Amino acid sequence: MVKETLIPPSSTSMTTGTSSSSSLSMTLSSTNALSFLSKGWREVWDSADADLQLMRDRANSVKNLASTFDREIENFLNNSARSAFPVGSPSASSFSNEIGIMKKLQPKISEFRRVYSAPEISRKVMERWGPARAKLGMDLSAIKKAIVSEMELDERQGVLEMSRLRRRRNSDRVRFTEFFAEAERDGEAYFGDWEPIRSLKSRFKEFEKRSSLEILSGFKNSEFVEKLKTSFKSIYKETDEAKDVPPLDVPELLACLVRQSEPFLDQIGVRKDTCDRIVESLCKCKSQQLWRLPSAQASDLIENDNHGVDLDMRIASVLQSTGHHYDGGFWTDFVKPETPENKRHVAIVTTASLPWMTGTAVNPLFRAAYLAKAAKQSVTLVVPWLCESDQELVYPNNLTFSSPEEQESYIRKWLEERIGFKADFKISFYPGKFSKERRSIFPAGDTSQFISSKDADIAILEEPEHLNWYYHGKRWTDKFNHVVGIVHTNYLEYIKREKNGALQAFFVNHVNNWVTRAYCDKVLRLSAATQDLPKSVVCNVHGVNPKFLMIGEKIAEERSRGEQAFSKGAYFLGKMVWAKGYRELIDLMAKHKSELGSFNLDVYGNGEDAVEVQRAAKKHDLNLNFLKGRDHADDALHKYKVFINPSISDVLCTATAEALAMGKFVVCADHPSNEFFRSFPNCLTYKTSEDFVSKVQEAMTKEPLPLTPEQMYNLSWEAATQRFMEYSDLDKILNNGEGGRKMRKSRSVPSFNEVVDGGLAFSHYVLTGNDFLRLCTGATPRTKDYDNQHCKDLNLVPPHVHKPIFGW
């Protein structure tokens, strides 16, 4: 909590002699200053009102007593007037007797006055007994004077007029001398023993003598303001102290760890009652430490013998003091919340986002749209959010976004222009950082926390190995009922091209097996070009943008009318990095330069290796025309007849599928990544460099065949979604959900494989929690948690608040 220093207000009409330092101290807003000043002044008035109300009540009680006494005297005189004996003019002896009787009553009145502490109330009461009573036959003036004289000898005090106070408070300017006018007329001696009133009166007199400028100029240094500032400081201090909850100490942390690890300890033979005794011993150790502390807080903490409840209360107090929201333990979060009937939730987590035109940005977006189109499940697409400095490095044409909402609007607009319907799914962002060395985006922090527990049902991890290399968070299979991984990239092929690539590929191969087994229930490989991962099957679950199929239909109609559909030759399109097939392309063109003759190839692409690629092509004097990168659906690319893709690092080239959908020839390598495309007649594969030349010449001299409806359907996202539902087992899961038998994690005894998977996940969690090991294995610095810029952009709670207790 950020504190604001409280500074008293200062008048804008200060004299010119006011120093610059004093004016600097009055820069706080007048609204805040006047608010607490008015509050302090209101407290003074409330306190004075309370005292005056008490005085008024006491005065009224004695006044009522005097009125009662007055009525008794009147009754007495009336009864005397009705008596049979005539009442004549009073004699001196009768007056003496009456005075004697009243003097006997006087101690009782003094007793009332002392009990109720009403200053000069007796004088006021006796003033009501005027000479008018003489018309009844008795002159009581002598009685009044005698009683007053007796009372003045006992105590002299003044009386505050309540009505006068109320009138002065409503006037424009309060004159405190008039407030005490009656007291001044009666004499200063009446207030001689009433110290609070005398002190207050002198203060008000001094205050009235000052001018407005003197009051305002001296107000900031007044004792009242200093005390008020001290009071506010004490209030803020008490608030901070109240929120300052001590962190969990070592015995409490160990007890908490033992309780959370009960399922794991049960698997290795440690019974629950043994765990309870360990927790109890640790709590007793904590209690013994508290006994040594001579404080009331310690005695309060050890009053309760229920150690389990005590530990829960301590953890709750620490979490509440930090604002952390706890969703469950590492081992105990097995039972997921119930989902609405016939409605499941699918979260798709990917490693890239538009406007970066890469496969992991485009394909998950289409998958989310077509899964949401089925309306059987709600869908959330979770994409990385990059800070502006990283956006400038990744997104083309210097395109940047100032907020996630702005980027989400761009993504939805781009998608709706291509699919032709409004996709009803949610887009969420997680913090990400771009690595220049790896040319990839890596998650920062626990990605799973950006999917709420109530929506944690089915997770689809696009590139599960990439997402989990340095993942340090809750295990995906513990938070979600079913986790499917989709392998997009052949990372081993990329790594082999680097320095010491064979050694690095060996370790990465085992790490990929490790993380996919620990965090996935099912793994889908787009082609056999990827490594054989645990729990994996090969299936192409990608489709093409409907716009490409429409282009293919349009070209087929033009050809049916006898028009020339293709007026251009061959082209290649892809990100301009060596691993995307540019090395193979230049080698093939350079080796068979003479056989290809005047064959020209237009190359579209942007990338980090653009300068080196163009330099290599120029060195071999190749007929390559390098052009700026374009969207594959751009009108400028419709008239090309042949698409050449010599890449063998792709898992499943999206551009190849798009070219086939547009009715073009495709010349590609005979490689597992192209296995899905071999069934299409327009796909020409080659095994050798000589075969490459013959396939290029064949494509340039012939016309491609139009696609059949079945072939077009196999390339569509509808077919890809159907294949995905089948091979990921989602159709079985969703059908079971519709039948009322939802798949749920349970606390039943796990199998041996599940125990091994849990151990792998736990060891990975421990190792990725060490910053030194992360840096040694190539992690992007400061990706264990998101940074302050991510907190500002995504309105996140700082990591030290989100993880207040402990971490690995």
Swiss-Prot record:
Induction data: 6-fold up-regulation by phosphate deficiency.
MF terms (GO), sorted A to Z: digalactosyldiacylglycerol synthase activity; glycosyltransferase activity; UDP-galactosyltransferase activity
Key words of the record: Chloroplast, Glycosyltransferase, Membrane, Plastid, Plastid outer membrane, Transferase, Transit peptide
Highest taxon, organism lineage: Eukaryota
Effect of deleting the gene: Altered thylakoid membrane lipid composition and stunted phenotype; this phenotype is reversed by the dgs1-1 gain-of-function mutation.
GO (cellular component) term, any one: chloroplast outer membrane
Disordered, as annotated region: 1-23
Subcellular locations according to the entry: Plastid, Chloroplast outer membrane
InterPro entries: DGDG1/2, Glyco_trans_1
Catalytic activity: a 1,2-diacyl-3-O-(beta-D-galactosyl)-sn-glycerol + UDP-alpha-D-galactose = a 1,2-diacyl-3-O-[alpha-D-galactosyl-(1->6)-beta-D-galactosyl]-sn-glycerol + UDP + H(+)
Keyword Transmembrane belongs to the record: no
Protein name: Digalactosyldiacylglycerol synthase 1, chloroplastic
Organism this protein belongs to: Arabidopsis thaliana (Mouse-ear cress)
Gene, per the UniProt record: DGD1
